[in-house]
């Protein structure tokens, strides 16, 4: 029994379930001399095959359990498969029995069938990956053919028309408000003119009453003048009668001339009295006329000053009313503009709040996807760690298996003439060193599509076989 050559092809580092296991870089140990090769342990990418006439059952059992733990159930694209392989054989049948070579051949056949099954499942996974990739390409191509740009133009035109209509409605409302304010202003002006007309009519009525009083006073004075004239005429008549009576009395007497002072002329005296009365009456008439004219002038001055003051006040009131009206019109226009701007602000806030809500939903969705990606990355890292530990354990068991095989080669030597077991105590330890380069690949997958792929080269590792 010669196990002088050991060749293995294995992935340098297990990969997460999203990639196919048992593929990647390979390492090969050719440190054992070529002259000692009789049986072989060979492998292809994704497989391990062992040929040996006899293997201890404990080693085979340990190797099968390690291989089963290193190849867990994996899933991809909705299909899953799980496999486990068990090796069992009696130690006496493998080491000391006559059918050790057949048992090892059976073991190799079962392992080959298992690896063939793994390869078929990997091929099935590749087909499913291709179908999924084609489906995503078709879906992506279908979505790209839809062009909504013309709808965006129509929406923009409709939004512009709505905005123009709103502005036109605001202008019409502003014109209506201005017309209402102008009508109210004209109504206020009419009411003010009405009040002014009533005030002027009242003033005219007052002046008419004063004129009537003045007319009555003038009539009274004229009546007094007429009375004075009548009294004067009566006095003149009485004087004439008295003069006639005196003259008649003097006509029947004897004319006696007395040397004395001349008597006063009565006619002249009466004439003087009449002139005095006439002057007094004329003076009273002039005084009455002067008083009347003075009172009329004062009254006219008071009326003119009052009318002027009233007119000035009314003019100021009208100017103030016009100013108030202009300010009210400007206030209404500003209020209408404020309402229109508030409406536009509310529409803008509502539109941008909806946009912000959509963006927040998108952010939450992306955060959820990112958390899922992180969880998936952590899960893949854990699976990677488990597979790497299984790989390390498998390599250790393979190294132990090789040492045991080489030890069994020295212990058990059979003679062609004497089919007995010869025990020979030899111990050979071969510890080749294999340097592997480790490369970590991180893929970011969103909706089944690879978004980004990063490779991180690691430090070289030394494996003692």
From Swiss-Prot:
Residues 247-269 are annotated as: Linker 12. SUPFAM superfamilies: Intermediate filament protein, coiled coil region (SSF64593). It comes from the Eukaryota. Type 1 keratin. May maintain oral mucosal cell homeostasis and tissue organization in response to mechanical stress. Residues 1-47 are annotated as: Disordered. Residues 99-135 are annotated as: Coil 1A. This is Keratin, type I cytoskeletal 13. Residues 1-28 have a biased composition (Polar residues). Belongs to the intermediate filament family. One of its GO terms (molecular function) is structural molecule activity. It comes from Protopterus aethiopicus (Marbled lungfish). Heterotetramer of two type I and two type II keratins. Expressed in skin. Residues 136-154 are annotated as: Linker 1. One of its GO terms (cellular component) is intermediate filament. There are two types of cytoskeletal and microfibrillar keratin: I (acidic; 40-55 kDa) and II (neutral to basic; 56-70 kDa). InterPro entries: IF_conserved, IF_rod_dom, Keratin_I. Residues 155-246 are annotated as: Coil 1B. Residues 409-465 are annotated as: Tail. Residues 270-408 are annotated as: Coil 2. Residues 100-412 form the IF rod domain. Keywords: Coiled coil, Intermediate filament, Keratin.
């Amino acid at each position: 029994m010669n196990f002088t050559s050991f060749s293995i092809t294995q992935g340098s580092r297990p990969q997460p379930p999203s990639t196919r296991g048992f593929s990647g870089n390979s390492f090969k140990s050719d440190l054992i001399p070529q002259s000692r090769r009789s049986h072989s342990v060979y492998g292809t990418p994704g497989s391990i095959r062992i040929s040996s006439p006899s293997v201890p059952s404990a080693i085979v059992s340990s190797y099968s359990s390690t291989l089963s733990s290193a190849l867990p159930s994996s899933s991809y694209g909705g299909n899953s498969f799980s496999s486990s392989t068990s090796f069992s054989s009696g130690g006496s049948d493998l080491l000391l029995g006559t059918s050790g070579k057949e048992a090892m051949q059976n073991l190799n056949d079962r392992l080959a069938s298992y690896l063939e099954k793994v390869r078929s499942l990997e091929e099935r996974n590749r087909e499913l990956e291709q179908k999924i990739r084609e489906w995503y390409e078709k879906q992506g191509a279908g979505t790209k053919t839809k062009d909504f740009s013309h709808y965006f133009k129509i929406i923009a035109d409709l939004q512009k028309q709505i905005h123009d209509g709103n502005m036109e409605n605001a202008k019409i409302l502003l014109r209506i408000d201005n017309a209402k304010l102008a009508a109210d202003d004209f109504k206020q002006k009419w009411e003010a003119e009405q009040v002014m007309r009533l005030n002027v009519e009242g003033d005219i009525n007052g002046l008419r009453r004063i004129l009537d009083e003045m007319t009555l006073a003038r009539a009274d004075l004229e009546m007094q003048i007429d009375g004075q004239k009548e009294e004067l005429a009566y006095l003149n008549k009485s004087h004439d009668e008295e003069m006639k009576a005196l003259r008649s009395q003097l006509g029947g007497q004897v004319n006696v001339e007395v040397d004395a002072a001349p008597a006063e002329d009565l006619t002249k005296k009466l004439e003087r009295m009449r002139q005095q009365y006439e002057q007094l009456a004329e003076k009273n008439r002039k005084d009455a006329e002067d008083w009347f004219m003075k009172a009329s002038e004062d009254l006219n001055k008071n009326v003119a000053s009052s009318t002027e003051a009233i007119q000035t006040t009314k003019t100021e009131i009208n100017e103030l009313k016009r100013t108030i009206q202009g300010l009210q019109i400007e206030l209404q226009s500003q209020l209408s503009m404020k309402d229109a701007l508030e409406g536009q602000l509310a529409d803008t806030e509502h539109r941008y709040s909806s946009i912000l809500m959509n963006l927040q939903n998108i952010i939450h969705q992306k955060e959820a996807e990112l958390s899922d990606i992180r969880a998936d990355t952590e899960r893949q890292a854990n699976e990677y760690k488990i597979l790497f530990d299984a790989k390390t354990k498998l390599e250790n068991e393979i190294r132990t298996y090789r040492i045991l095989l080489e030890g069994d080669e020295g212990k058990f030597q059979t003679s062609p003439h004497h089919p007995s077991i010869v025990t020979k105590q030899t111990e050979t330890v071969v510890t080749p060193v294999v340097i592997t380069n480790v490369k970590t690949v991180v893929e970011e997958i969103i909706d089944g599509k690879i978004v980004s792929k990063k490779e991180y080269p690691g430090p070289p590792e030394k494996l003692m076989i």
